[in-house]
Swiss-Prot record:
One BP term from GO: tRNA thio-modification
Gene behind the chain: urm1
Cross-link (Glycyl lysine isopeptide (Gly-Lys) (interchain with K-? in acceptor proteins)): G120
GO cellular component terms given for this protein: cytosol
Cellular compartments annotated: Cytoplasm
SUPFAM superfamilies per record: MoaD/ThiS
Post-translational modification: C-terminal thiocarboxylation occurs in 2 steps, it is first acyl-adenylated (-COAMP) via the hesA/moeB/thiF part of UBA4, then thiocarboxylated (-COSH) via the rhodanese domain of UBA4.
Lineage of source species: Eukaryota, Fungi, Dikarya, Ascomycota, Pezizomycotina
Pathway this chain belongs to: tRNA modification; 5-methoxycarbonylmethyl-2-thiouridine-tRNA biosynthesis
Name of the protein described by the UniProt record: Ubiquitin-related modifier 1
Organism (species): Aspergillus oryzae (strain ATCC 42149 / RIB 40) (Yellow koji mold)
Amino acid sequence: MTTDTEINPESARPEAHGSLSVTVEFTGGLEMLFSNERKHSVTLPARLSDGGRPSISFLLEYLVKNVMKDERKELFMLEDNVRPGILVLINDADWELEGEEKYELQPADNIVFVSTLHGG
C-alpha cells in the first residue's frame, strides 16, 4: 500500500519550477513509526525558496513533520540525521556513496530506510 503525501506549504515554498515526486520506503520495523505503511509517495517542491534542490536532509525533516504519525522522533532521528543503525539506500546504493544527507533528490528517486536493529 502506498500513501500519497503532498507538501505542507509551511514546510517549504514551491517555486515556479514545479514539484518532485520520490518514493520512500521503511523496513526493519521503521514502518511502525509511519502508520505501519512501508511505502510512501512523497511530493516535494522541485526548488526550495533559496533556489536549491531538496536534499535528503530536507526530506528527513519533511518526513518527521508531515508523514511520521508516531511521536517518538528519536527512534528515527538523532539531532538532524538518521539514528545510528539505520541504513539509508538511494536508488539501491548506500547513501554514503551519494553524499549522505547532502544528496540532492532527483525525480523518481527511491529512498529506503532500513533499521538494522530490528532484523533489517
